[in-house]
Amino acid sequence: MENFALSLENVEKYFPPAASGWRALLHPVSRLTVPALRGVSFEVKQGEVLALVGANGAGKSTLLRILTTLLLPTRGRAQVCGFDVAREPAKVRLQIGYHTGGDACFYSRLSARENLVLFAGLNNLSDAEASRRIAELTGTFGLGELLDRQVRTLSTGNIHRLGLARAMLHRPSVLLLDEPTRSLDPLAAAEFRRFLLQDIVGAHGTTLIFASHTLAEVEQLAGRIAVLDGGRLLACDTLAGVKAAAGADTLEESLEILTRRAARETQ
């Protein structure tokens, strides 16, 4: 039996219409009437790159938050490297690195090095191991000149690099990215995508799962594409497979056709 980096079986997530965050936990399932994910199932092999695509509200960020254990599924089962996100969240967190676009929640008045040391401690790395990993990642991510600068003085592109370094501190098997090139200019975004493919996936064999609205980015990075709409999984296949399923010539046309088809089927 093949071991998967990620496995989802009929994952559903519902939120109460007037509650969010921790308040959502207080409502019984029967009152959870706003669907964010509905019966999502797919598997991802180790070292694979999977893109999550769909309009705002399709369920991409909700799915990523479930995989990080920030949210729990209402129904169904999600596993990361064989560990259940609901029953074994601590073990799941040891397997994943998570990075979003934006400021990545660093302590802005601390230096880049101080931030990495802090997060290494939160990931239970010893002082010696933290020093080794920071030295390794400094070379991998080109952070040498930045380590002793306050985070608030860094460019958006450099903060992205620092965020990836933080996510990779504990050698995760799976890297989860939400809009990874948001706020980057075109040149910085292109460099960031090259960096992901060559230095993260290529060099380390890391499984990469990312959500993006940039279809050119999806086509460049992803081995497979998961198309979400209204919390439902419409397709999960290679670019060629998605286009064939829709009978379209481009990814953009495919998303439009698959979304319209799903809307007709649910009427």
What are the roles of these predicted feature ranges?
Residues 22, 117, 121, 128-146:
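Conserved ABC ATPase "signature" region
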Residues 189-204:
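Helical segment within the ABC ATPase nucleotide-binding domain
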Residues 150-154:
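Conserved ABC ATPase signature
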